[in-house]
């Protein structure tokens, strides 16, 4: 209801520039306060229209033009927006790629590289994120030379909110940001959080008429609702999401497939990864979609939506069997639809 409300055609600025916007201002402040509560932060901005915009705003506030950033390689599992011809080109940054090992950042090599290169910001986050990032291991050293740690929680924001993944701000990240529609079950949009007063001020002063103007207050209202739901039910939701991901991975293995795992296990997040070469991955994705099972060209699976519809470990086993059968040539469309139709109501509200 909030997302489809009349606020979708209204806008406001602080201080109250437009008359008749008192209730919009109240909703705006409510969303920020809920964000501070849920994530344990002193500052929260709900102005970004996406996680991408939130990342640009965070970097603009912490890295000068001509500066250097370090990030997970976009060609490996990192965010494509940090490729050299994307955000870095727009904001005028050079980029170094953090070394990886078994789908994790290689901490020893990363510490050595960052100590040598001294990037203005180390961006920790990835599009394929199975395991926690080494925030604590890098933060003390980065802070020692005056750099900042920016944690892009876009994919794991709901798990952070639920307290079942790492807690970046407590571990030393200066800024945490993310999109609000992935593991966090809100509307499309972005959020920025920090406990650093100086960075908060820089983010605020560079927000309006630089990165955004109208911040879509129907979105802000819907985000406030989602934040309140997460405040009440986040722990239970996030716990079940991760449990379902682990069960799905184990069930895929039992069904004869080979989900990625390293010495830590299959996953600590909502994601499960089936590693294929690029051309084969596209074929796998296409087969699954024809059978009403949605993955991406990765091949990544996520357990957030099925969890929010009330599915548990039993259904993860059923889904794994359907995936294996489909990839073995069977037509499982009807079975997939039948399973989905048994779980139509939304939980954790």
Name what the model sees in each region.
Residues 13-18, 217-218, 348-349:
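Short coil/turn segments at secondary-structure boundaries
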Residues 5-10, 210, 244, 248, ...:
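A short structural micro-motif
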Residues 1-18:
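N-terminal "arm"/small-domain region of PLP-dependent enzymes with the aminotransferase-like
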Residues 243, 247, 299-349:
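PLP-dependent enzyme catalytic core of the Aspartate aminotransferase-like
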Residues 19-26, 30-258, 304-311:
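Conserved PLP-enzyme active-site core in the AAT-like
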Residues 16, 184, 264-268, 288-289, ...:
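A structural signal for short secondary-structure junctions
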Residues 211, 291-295, 327:
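A common structural junction motif
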Residues 227, 238-302:
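Conserved small-domain helix->loop->beta segment predominantly found in fold-type I
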């Amino acid at each position: 209801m909030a997302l489809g409300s009349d606020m979708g055609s209204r806008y406001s600025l602080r201080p109250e520039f437009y008359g008749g916007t008192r209730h919009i201002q109240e909703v705006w402040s409510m969303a920020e306060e809920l964000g501070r509560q849920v994530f344990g932060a002193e500052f929260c901005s709900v102005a970004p229209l996406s996680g991408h915009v939130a990342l640009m705003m965070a970097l603009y506030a912490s890295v000068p033009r001509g500066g250097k950033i370090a990030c997970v390689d976009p060609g490996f599992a990192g965010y494509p927006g940090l490729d050299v011809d994307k955000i870095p080109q727009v904001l005028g940054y050079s980029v170094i790629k953090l070394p990886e090992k078994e789908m994790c950042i290689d901490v020893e090599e990363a510490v050595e590289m960052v100590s040598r290169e001294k990037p203005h910001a180390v961006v920790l986050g990835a599009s394929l994120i199975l395991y926690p990032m080494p925030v604590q291991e890098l933060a003390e050293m980065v802070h020692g030379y005056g750099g900042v740690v920016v944690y892009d929680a876009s994919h794991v924001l709901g798990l952070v909110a639920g307290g079942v993944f790492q807690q970046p701000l407590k571990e030393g990240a200066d800024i945490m940001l993310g999109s609000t529609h992935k593991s966090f079950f809100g509307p499309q949009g972005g959020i920025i959080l920090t406990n650093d007063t100086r960075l908060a001020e820089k983010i605020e002063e560079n927000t309006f008429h630089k990165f955004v103007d109208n911040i879509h207050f129907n979105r802000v209202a819907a985000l406030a609702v989602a934040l309140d739901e997460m405040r009440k039910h986040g722990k239970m939701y996030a716990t079940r999401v991760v449990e379902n991901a682990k069960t799905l991975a184990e069930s895929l293995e039992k069904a004869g497939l080979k989900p990625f795992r390293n010495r830590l296990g299959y996953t600590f997040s909502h994601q499960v990864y089936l590693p294929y070469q690029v051309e084969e991955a596209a074929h796998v994705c296409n087969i699954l979609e024809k059978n009403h099972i949605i993955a991406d060209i990765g091949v990544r699976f996520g357990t957030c939506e099925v969890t929010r519809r009330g599915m548990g470990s039993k259904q993860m086993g059923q889904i794994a069997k359907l995936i294996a059968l489909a990839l073995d040539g069977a037509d499982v469309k009807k079975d997939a639809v039948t399973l989905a139709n048994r779980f139509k109501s939304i939980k954790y509200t």
